[in-house]
């Protein structure tokens, strides 16, 4: 168990190596250069053994280790091919050489004076005969005589006496005397009334002018001594000694030391790369006038069969685009050449093996009908904190945290989106390996370690990975998790709509990524709170040009960025989806006031976090047939 724990913390420690400002793109097995004089190879952080020697010797720091990218579970770093310990060994040899030279300092003085008798036995015997000054006839030389003698040993020296205050002639202070019951004037049958710490290093405590009642001895009086020293109490402000309650001297002003400590903590967090904003007092507006209750909206939910009428003639014709769904077979870009698609360009129609769904209009798709069911409740979502990164409770009720069994405990390494009451949409690379089998899904939680009331943990019973997905490429990176039971919808748990239009949305729309992944590329701190970041779509030609500069893209993206993929990035290279956010949604916000949004993509992969290379996302609208065939088979939802 100790080895498992050590390995676990070692893996977590190696994740810190991704703080390097030098990003080298590659997959496992690709050659790389750690430094100009140190060759390397791209390996996972847990498989790199040589890096420990470089870090311990000081040859490299964590910020100097290049990153090759991210794998399914951990980061791929540029691992040195040559082991490092020469520096440490050199220091040890130098240290031992110094100590040996010091121990042999008197030997050079003996070399110029050669001794005529080189044999050590002859020399030692001669020295014993010449230097012997003891009488061999005395009793202590004969052990038998020593045992048989009856003579008492004579006292040859006086015993050492300890000095006293009288011999040292030092004045005696009255406070140095031990107190007695008579001096303290306390009854002997009531030992529990002794004052706390009455005798210490400074003598007896001064007597009190007024006696203290026995019911008020739960705290010490200020005049009993010095202030107690607070040792190893983290993140605590200095506090005053407890005093008796007095309404006249009650002070409501906070101590200035509290503000100083808060500023000190904020400064240290800013040095680590965190963004600390000053607190702002938001006045709470009390609504005195009664707000109009949503009386007409609940009446729409009385009829349980209303959501299933998705083929009626009386449906609003402007809710979804009227363009037909031409590509229903998901044969995405069969040509091997890189495809730079035009957002306004539509793909040619391919024959559909399913005759029941040929040229199905957008309005008749099960995903569109399911979205209308979700939005028919008439209950707006909670408004976001627009200028912040933290997501308010109820803003993204579709967010799901995927838990994996890691040495008997739950580890949340990927995210997902609840698209139906029993199905979660995520990335295929999050669930593709044996050690990445999801255990359960946590819904309705902002803090995944300390979830708020109302969250639900539902086991995963089935994993559906796209049949064309391969772990060696970035295409078809999409999967669906089936839950053991239906999620109970509430204000914080609700499915999300899927964006069904194949073309890119207008430029004035807002895009956000949300998740619990790495929030600081400097110290690799993982967020426990659901966060989001605003991104911009990157055109396909610019995205292909960026990925063409990465050597490993020739293997993982042989056809380039195709029409079933999206690219998004932050122009300032400060915000991005990072490790731990994989599988989460790329959210298209249509109206940030009433919370109308759709899921346009799934977080797939990227080269580093917040780099000049955009992040890669799986376009949801390209896989509607695949999703609907699992979630809503036979047009049932």
From Swiss-Prot:
UniProt entry tagged with the keyword Iron-sulfur: no
Keywords: Disulfide bond, Hydrolase, Immunity, Melanin biosynthesis, Protease, Secreted, Serine protease, Signal
Biological processes annotated in GO: defense response to fungus; innate immune response; melanin biosynthetic process; positive regulation of melanization defense response; proteolysis; regulation of melanization defense response; Toll receptor ligand protein activation cascade
Residue ranges occupied by any Peptidase S1 domain in the UniProt entry: 385-632
PROSITE patterns hit by this protein: CLIP, TRYPSIN_DOM, TRYPSIN_HIS, TRYPSIN_SER
Upregulating conditions: Up-regulated after wounding to the integument. Levels are higher with septic wounding, using either Gram-negative or Gram-positive bacteria.
Function: Serine protease which, by converting prophenoloxidase 1 (PPO1) into its active form, plays an essential role in the melanization immune response to physical or septic wounding. May function in diverse PPO1-activating cascades that are negatively controlled by different serpin proteins; Spn27A and Spn28D in the hemolymph, and Spn28D and Spn77BA in the trachea. Also required in the systematic wound response by mediating the redox-dependent activation of the JNK cytoprotective cascade in neuronal tissues after integument wounding.
Protein name as it appears in the record: Serine protease Hayan
Protein source organism: Drosophila melanogaster
């Amino acid at each position: 168990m100790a080895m498992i724990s050590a390995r676990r913390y070692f893996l977590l420690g190696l994740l810190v190596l991704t703080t390097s400002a030098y990003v080298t793109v590659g997959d496992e097995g690709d050659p790389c250069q750690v430094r100009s004089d140190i060759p390397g190879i791209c390996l996972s952080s847990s498989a790199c053994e040589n890096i420990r020697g470089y870090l311990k010797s000081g040859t490299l720091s964590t910020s100097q280790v290049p990153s090759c990218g991210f794998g399914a579970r951990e980061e791929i770093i540029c691992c040195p091919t040559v082991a490092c310990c020469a520096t440490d060994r050199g220091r040890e040899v130098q240290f031992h050489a110094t100590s040996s030279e010091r121990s042999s300092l008197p030997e050079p003085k003996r070399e110029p004076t050669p001794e005529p008798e080189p044999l050590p036995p002859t020399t030692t015997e001669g020295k014993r005969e010449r230097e012997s000054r003891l009488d061999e006839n005395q009793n202590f030389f004969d052990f038998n005589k020593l045992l048989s003698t009856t003579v008492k040993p004579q006292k040859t020296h006086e015993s050492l006496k300890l000095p006293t205050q009288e011999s040292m002639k030092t004045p005696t202070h009255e406070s140095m005397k031990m107190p007695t019951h008579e001096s303290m004037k306390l009854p002997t049958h009531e030992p529990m009334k002794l004052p706390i710490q009455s005798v210490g290093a400074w003598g007896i405590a001064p007597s009190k002018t007024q006696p203290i009642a026995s019911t008020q001895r739960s705290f010490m009086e200020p005049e009993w001594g010095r202030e107690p020293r607070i040792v190893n109490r983290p993140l605590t402000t200095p506090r005053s000694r407890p005093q008796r309650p007095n309404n006249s001297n009650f002070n409501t002003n906070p101590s200035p030391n509290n503000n100083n400590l808060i500023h000190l903590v904020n400064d240290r967090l800013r040095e680590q790369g965190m963004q600390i904003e000053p607190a702002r007092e938001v006045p709470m507006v009390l609504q005195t006038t009664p707000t109009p209750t949503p009386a007409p909206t609940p009446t729409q939910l009385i009829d349980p069969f209303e959501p299933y009428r998705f083929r009626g003639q009386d449906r609003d014709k402007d809710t979804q685009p009227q363009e037909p769904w031409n590509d229903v077979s998901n044969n995405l870009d069969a040509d091997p050449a890189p495809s730079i698609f035009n957002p306004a360009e539509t793909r040619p129609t391919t024959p559909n093996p399913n005759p029941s769904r040929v040229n199905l209009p957008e309005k008749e798709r099960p995903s569109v009908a399911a979205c209308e069911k979700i939005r028919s409740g008439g209950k707006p979502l909670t408004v976001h904190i627009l200028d912040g990164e933290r997501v308010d409770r109820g803003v993204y009720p579709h967010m799901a945290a995927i838990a994996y069994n890691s040495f008997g405990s739950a580890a949340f390494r990927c995210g997902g989106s609840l698209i139906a009451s029993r199905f979660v949409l995520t990335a295929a690379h999050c669930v593709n390996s044996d050690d990445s089998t999801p255990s359960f899904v946590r819904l309705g939680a902002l803090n995944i370690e300390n979830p708020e009331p109302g969250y639900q943990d539902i086991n995963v019973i089935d994993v559906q990975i796209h049949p064309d997905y391969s772990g060696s490429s970035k295409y078809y990176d999409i999967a669906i998790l089936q839950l053991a039971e239906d999620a109970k919808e509430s204000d914080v748990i609700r499915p999300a709509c899927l964006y069904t239009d194949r073309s890119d949305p207008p430029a004035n729309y807002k895009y956000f990524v949300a998740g619990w992944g790495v929030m600081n590329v400097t110290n690799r701190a993982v967020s426990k709170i659901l966060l989001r970041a605003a991104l911009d779509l990157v055109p396909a030609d610019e995205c292909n040009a960026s990925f063409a500069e990465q050597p490993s893209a020739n293997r993982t993206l042989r056809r380039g960025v195709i029409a079933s993929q999206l690219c998004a990035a932050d122009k300032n290279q400060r915000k991005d989806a990072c490790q731990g956010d994989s599988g989460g949604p790329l959210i298209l916000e249509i109206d940030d006031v009433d919370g109308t949004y759709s899921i346009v993509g799934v977080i797939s992969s990227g080269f580093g976090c917040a780099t000049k290379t955009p992040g890669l996302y799986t376009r949801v609208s390209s896989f509607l047939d695949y999703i609907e065939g699992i979630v809503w088979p036979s047009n049932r939802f």
